[in-house]
């Protein structure tokens, strides 16, 4: 982690997001109704989904902190992928309703220009949500938390949608009343796309997709550079919530005693944990190299 307090931020960030989302939901909803902006009202529903998403994220972080037990011997880390999928689903469902309502409004021709105050309100929410995105994406990346990263993108989608609302309202005020409704359609398409991306990433995590090739190459290099390691004949890695797990099978000098072989394996494990961020569970299987092989010391 970059800073010592990154772990503390992990415990605080979602509460800040939860509070900000509640304020933004009420602010945009009330201002949208008062100003007559259908896009801003729709955007407030998006923020309402953010409130639920922040609550789900907070719950998943609490559960993922639980230690491994007999029922879940690999820990509770994958609950964060479920949280990410729920957030993505909420965005997708909300976008679908918003798209439907906006298209019906566009076809029927029942639209009128909202007040310019809607644009001012949207500009405030753009700033707040972008700040929350930057805060959460920093904390999420430093803690390798898919749940916090998903929540960050939820706020980024809210910032972008509010920006679209602002443009639509301004265009409506200067003589294009249809622009507010078109902005709502654009917002719904964007939010739906982000929702699908979050769901896709969650599915990859739950299906134990491999870590990046670069990370595997780093682990491979660390292991082969460790003294008395002859070769690596199997290596795989996966994400489990915030942690990275590796399964490594290596060969050592056949003349080594069992105790010494274990010490070599422990050296590999320690180096990987020290040099690869979030590497928590390193599973090693050691076997002797062919007797004729000369091993580097």
Swiss-Prot record:
UniProt-recorded Gene Ontology molecular function terms: metal ion binding; monoatomic cation transmembrane transporter activity
Topological domain spans for side Cytoplasmic: 1-12, 105-112, 186-297
Gene Ontology biological-process annotations: iron ion transport
Induction record: Part of the probable 17 gene mamAB operon.
Cell compartment(s), UniProt: Cell inner membrane; Magnetosome membrane
Keyword Zinc: no
InterPro entries: Cation_efflux, Cation_efflux_CTD, Cation_efflux_CTD_sf, Cation_efflux_TMD_sf, CDF_Transporter, Magnetosome_CDF_Transporter
Disruption phenotype: The most severe single mam gene deletion. Single gene disruption has no accumulation of magnetite, no intracellular magnetosome vesicles form, wild type levels of MamM, mislocation of MamC in 1-3 foci, MamI mislocalized in 1 to a few patches. Deletion of approximately 80 kb of DNA, including this operon, leads to cells that are non-magnetic, lack internal membrane systems, grow poorly, have reduced mobility and take-up and accumulate iron poorly.
Annotated segments matching region C-terminal domain (CTD): 215-297
Coiled-coil features, chain-numbered ranges: none
Keywords, ordered alphabetically: Biomineralization, Cell inner membrane, Cell membrane, Ion transport, Iron, Iron transport, Magnetosome, Membrane, Metal-binding, Transmembrane, Transmembrane helix, Transport
GO cellular component: magnetosome membrane; plasma membrane
Region (Transmembrane domain (TMD)): 1-214
One Pfam short name: Cation_efflux
Topology in membrane: Multi-pass membrane protein
Transmembrane spans: 13-33, 84-104, 113-133, 165-185
Highest taxon of the lineage: Bacteria
Lumenal-side positions: 34-83, 134-164
NCBIfam families per the UniProt record, alphabetical: CDF, CDF_MamB
Domain comment, as recorded: The C-terminal domain (CTD) is probably responsible for hetero- and homodimerization and binds 1 Fe cation per subunit. The CTD assumes a V-shaped, dimeric metallo-chaperone-like fold.
Family affiliation: Belongs to the cation diffusion facilitator (CDF) transporter (TC 2.A.4) family.
Note: This bacteria makes up to 60 cubo-octahedral magnetosomes of about 45 nm in diameter which contain membrane-bound crystals of magnetite (Fe(3)O(4)). Expression of just the minimal mamAB gene cluster (MGMSRv2__2365 to MGMSRv2__2381), including this gene, is sufficient to form a minimal magnetosome chain with small magnetite particles.
Role summary: Plays a dual, essential role in magnetosome formation; required for magnetosome vesicle formation as well as biomineralization. Requires heterodimerization with MamM for stability. Probably binds and transports iron. One of 7 genes (mamLQBIEMO) able to induce magnetosome membrane biogenesis; coexpression of mamLQRBIEMO in a deletion of the 17 gene mamAB operon restores magnetosome vesicle formation but not magnetite biosynthesis.
UniProt subunit comment: Forms homodimers via its C-terminal domain, may form higher order multimers that are sensitive to reducing agent. Probably interacts with MamE. Interacts with MamM via their C-terminal domains.
Protein name, entry field: Magnetosome protein MamB
Gene that encodes the chain: mamB
